[in-house]
Amino acid sequence: MIETDRETFTALADDGPAIVRVAADLDIDVAPLTAYDALVADADDHAFLLESAEKTPASDPDGAFTPDTTTEETRHARYSFVGYDPAAVVTVDPDDTTITRLRDDPITDLLDAPDHATGDVLDRLRSVMPAVPRRNIPTEDRQLLDGGLVGFLAYDAVYDLWLDEVGVERPPTPLPDAEFAVTTRTLVFDRATDSVSLVCTPVADADTATDVYDALEAEAKRVQAVLRDATAPATAGIEVTTERAGDRDAYTDAVETAATAVRDGEVYQAVVSRTRELDGDIDPRALYDALRAVNPSPYMFLLAHGDHTVVGASPETLVAVHDDTVVTNPIAGTCQRGASPVADRRLAGEMLADEKERAEHTMLVDLARNDVRRVSAPGTVSVPEFMRVLKYSHVQHIESTVTGTLAADADAFDATRAAFPAGTLSGAPKVRAMEHIDAIEATPRGIYGGGVGYFSWTGDAELAITIRSGTITHTGDEDTLTVRAGAGVVADSDPDAEYEETEAKMDGVLAAVDRLRTTDDGEAVHR
């Protein structure tokens, strides 16, 4: 069952401690969400599901989208990851870093570093990474998450990274700056080979190799047995008792304030966001399943972290580091979907012909190029894709791709710092735009506008921008779902149009809620 035999594993661990990657092929036929449900059961305080969903006719009831097999539509869609039973959780708060051990695992003995409480949030995450060799890592045709840190970087980390040094006082923030599970067991679904494997990255040395291998064999057999008997969970409804959409006038006033700052030469653009909140009985797994159906996206995520769960369908890469390549994916320019392919093309053409949209997008691509250049070798930054229109369930976006070759003295944490936050979620110049956001927006952003993803043991990393998402806070007998969206404000922005843009960007999550909404007596309501 395990691809690496016992003798080879023992030899790899002989002069350890080392992180040794092993994989077991599983003979199962279950969907990733079913596997997630079966493996985490009632112990899902910390677990994750990361997927890349292709768009299908079933996800587009108006028939406006016909899927194809071009690179831009399938580039993310090969792997799904289910992480369960993490060894520990790393929580980075403004003044502290906490490592909470969740089970007996040798890797937890390697997590404490002398400097894990110093530096900024990304320095502190880096310091947690075990300073031991990584062995048995495939070099070709592999997924890039081989265990590591999986979680979120909240937008509010900007105070630690950028705003503290310019004297902006940090407000109370609802969530940690970062929270990442230390993952050594990951279920990997590979669509290209139609296979499922359990990838484990245990710590072993000469004294422990035999026992570690025995435990891996037992875990692979246990997981296969659990998943062979797994069935898709019944779809839970969502009962919403209270909704708060915020004050429209307050938002349009905030947009006008930002536009005035642009006209006064303070910034070129600022992204102003607003929040909707729904209280009630909200099942995160049901919401994820519905969101995947109505808004399949390159980055689908279900991230359970104790008293809060993040569910999302992001189209946009914050930063990716694969081997020595840095990638970011600025998206700026939004229009509605049409009711037919002809209407889609008309709306997309109007968007591409709009001078404001083109200028805004070009500015943000230039900002992304500058971000990537900060951590890239000289002369390696390029824009292989510029101003392409991609379609999603409720909107169309103008997208570009910026790449560079990672400098020899930089790593994935440096690349994340350079890209964070995305210019498409802050504005330009970044720091000055963030100062205005702090002054204009009524509440801290929390996870919205940050990043969700992973830092692999291998040095690879990939984080999506946390947009088209919702954070479910579990408090007592009731849950609160917070959905947030923003619009880029320039000198001639129409406040009412920007408000409608935020509504369109929230539509994916809210449509998923409506798909599951029930009445007080449990009857389904579909609107």
Swiss-Prot record:
Catalytic activity: chorismate + L-glutamine = anthranilate + pyruvate + L-glutamate + H(+)
Cofactor(s) named in the record: Mg(2+)
Example GO biological process: L-tryptophan biosynthetic process
UniProt cross-references to SUPFAM superfamilies, sorted A to Z: ADC synthase (SSF56322)
Residues that, per the record, bind Mg(2+): 360, 501
Major enzyme class: lyase
GO terms, molecular function: anthranilate synthase activity; metal ion binding
Binding site for chorismate: 333-334, 448, 468, 486-488
EC number: 4.1.3.27
Pfam families registered for this protein in UniProt: Anth_synt_I_N (PF04715), Chorismate_bind (PF00425)
Region Disordered: start-end pairs: 53-72
Keyword field: Amino-acid biosynthesis, Aromatic amino acid biosynthesis, Lyase, Magnesium, Metal-binding, Tryptophan biosynthesis
Manner of cofactor binding, per the entry note: Binds 1 Mg(2+) ion per subunit.
Additional free-text comment from the UniProt record: Component I catalyzes the formation of anthranilate using ammonia rather than glutamine, whereas component II provides glutamine amidotransferase activity.
NCBIfam families: TrpE-arch
Record's protein name: Anthranilate synthase component 1 1
Organism: Halobacterium salinarum (strain ATCC 700922 / JCM 11081 / NRC-1)
